[in-house]
């Protein structure tokens, strides 16, 4: 049943959603991914339950007690609304480079070009922030923000 799946051109973290009826695959994508959409799940008080089968990077659920080898079924749901960006250090744990991703994101959002340059905007690509976007409790579209910051720099230089 294609309605219960999200078809992604590319990988789960950096790919884009494809409509099975009218969509197309990206020219440079080397994989196609299908994950459950998650719209068939009905959780009564999902936020208030211990969540033994749910993945959480921040140990918000008790599933971390089951051991590190536990397998999780992840789907495409955001599970909640957008929230304010908080400085929790969760990006630092998964970011592959030695820069301050939270401060860089705040500089990009504020359109502060001098601060973006000082914090290393020239060293990053939106895909570098894919894991940050996955573990983000604020559900911010971090890759889109970084792409906007890089586009702003390009526009300023030309």
What are these regions (language model features)?
Residues 1-158:
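Redox cofactor-anchoring modules in respiratory/redox and cofactor-processing assemblies
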């Amino acid at each position: 049943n294609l309605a219960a799946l999200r078809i992604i051109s590319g990988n789960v973290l950096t790919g884009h959603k494809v409509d099975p009826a009218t969509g197309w695959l990206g020219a440079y994508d080397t994989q196609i991914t299908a994950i459950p959409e998650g719209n068939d799940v009905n959780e009564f008080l999902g936020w208030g339950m211990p969540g033994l089968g749910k993945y959480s990077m921040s140990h918000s659920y008790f599933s971390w007690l089951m051991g590190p080898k536990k397998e999780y079924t992840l789907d495409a749901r955001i599970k909640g609304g957008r929230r304010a960006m908080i400085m929790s250090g969760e990006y630092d744990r998964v970011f592959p480079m030695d820069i301050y991703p939270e401060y860089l994101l705040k500089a990009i959002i504020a359109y502060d070009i001098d601060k973006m340059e000082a914090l290393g905007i020239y060293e990053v690509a939106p895909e570098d922030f894919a894991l940050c976007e996955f573990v983000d409790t604020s559900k911010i579209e971090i890759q889109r923000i970084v792409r906007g910051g890089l586009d702003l720099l390009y526009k300023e230089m030309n």
